[in-house]
Amino acid sequence: MKSEQLKQFERYAEAVGAERYRVTSIKMQADGRKQTFILDKKDGITRGFTPQEIEQRTPEMQRLQRRGENLYYTPLSDKKHHILIDDMNREKLERLIKDGYQPAAVLESSPGNYQAIITVSKLGTAHDKDVGNRLSDALNREYGDPKLSGAIHPHRAPGYENRKPKHQREDGSYPEVRLLKAERRECVKALALSSQIDAEYQRQAALKAQQPERTKAKPALELAAASGSAIDAYQRHYRDVLKRQRGGEVDLSRVDSMIAVRMRVTGHDQAAIEGAIRQCAPATRQKDEGRDWNDYAQRTARYAYSAAQPQAADLGKYRQQWEKLEGREPVRQQEQAKAQKIERDNSPGMSL
């Protein structure tokens, strides 16, 4: 008779539709360290298991759980992205679905905490890897864990226990990872977003191909410069956003994303936003995060001009308010002042 873990895997795999599944076991040490073991890894290479091989390996996975280890799946496919949206509460999960995204699988990884896997076909272009990474980054910034990066990412295995020490119950047991939804489908909205991201890469590649040879000889990474006004705008928005946060730990990556969208609304271009984040964001952290700030600034500014485009349009009603925050006259007031000046200049002068 099939075990409950195998039944849950079969429902999950039928929905996600991956070609192979990497299985990772993580042992949580008493001192907080993690010991990681990838079941199929051999000579430094891991390709994952077919669904049939998972069935054969299930008894081994059950033994690992009895030893106190945590089990994870990573879906792998040559022609599909399987995007994990991690660390969602119920509100974020409902918003994801309300906004039109269609997860193939939804997991309750711990009580009140959810993970979703969205399947979307790769476009078959030279930019597939970058598109997948950008798609994961955009969706997690908006709905999940903004620190999560990369399109290929492990998630909790349904049917097995979440053995994080903080989840241990009074009787010594642990909550089981629950498969709440499993439906074989690909997400149309995520495909549209990936097409938009790919088109941006295609445009960049076309522009680069048109550059003269002397320009191509420059270093590949040209950092955007931040004007004084952009830096000042970042700092003003940073103080304003923090002032509006209520209790708990502030997610500074999400704060930077909010600032980037605000600055787009008030008319700063992508390069100026990127430069301001690169220059200002490291100073807002109390400790060194070991982050590549150039890449971080590029991704955050890009987010404001791609995935957050609908959000920026909705927030246009706050433009004048945010322009005042930046210490600038709203555009409408500038236009009125300009019109009044022209009217004065064209009016007949008074003679004494």
UniProtKB/Swiss-Prot annotation:
InterPro entries given in the database record: RepB-like_DNA_primase_dom, RepB/MobA-like_C
Top-rank taxon, per record: Bacteria
Transmembrane intervals: none
Region (Disordered): 145-172, 318-352
Ranges of biased composition (kind: Basic and acidic residues): 318-332
Presence of keyword Amino-acid biosynthesis: no
GO terms, molecular function: nucleotidyltransferase activity
GO biological-process terms attached to the record: DNA replication
GO CC annotation, single: DNA-directed RNA polymerase complex
Assigned EC number: 2.7.7.-
Keywords: DNA replication, DNA-directed RNA polymerase, Nucleotidyltransferase, Plasmid, Transcription, Transferase
Function, in words: Functions as a primase with respect to replication at the (vegetative) origin of replication of pTF-FC2.
Name listed for the protein in its UniProt record: DNA primase
Gene from which the chain derives: repB
